[in-house]
Amino acid sequence: MASSTDVRPKITLACETCKHRNYITKKNRRNDPDRLEIKKFCPNCGSHQPHKESR
């Protein structure tokens, strides 16, 4: 299956304010070695909030 050294692993994005895990996406480890942070819409908060990569 997927190894831990996969170049494009699946990650979960969690809202910064309410901590709900709203989005699942993939990222390229070579281009983005740090934890990803994107501003996306949170349906629980009802507004655009920063979402961070959760473990």
Swiss-Prot record:
A GO BP annotation: translation
Any single Gene Ontology cellular-component annotation: ribonucleoprotein complex
Pfam family, one: Ribosomal_L33
Keywords assigned by UniProt, alphabetized: Ribonucleoprotein, Ribosomal protein
GO molecular function list: structural constituent of ribosome
Domain of life according to the entry: Bacteria
Coiled-coil parts of chain: none
Family annotation (NCBIfam families): PRK00504.1, PRK00595.1, rpmG_bact
Family: Belongs to the bacterial ribosomal protein bL33 family.
Protein name: Large ribosomal subunit protein bL33B
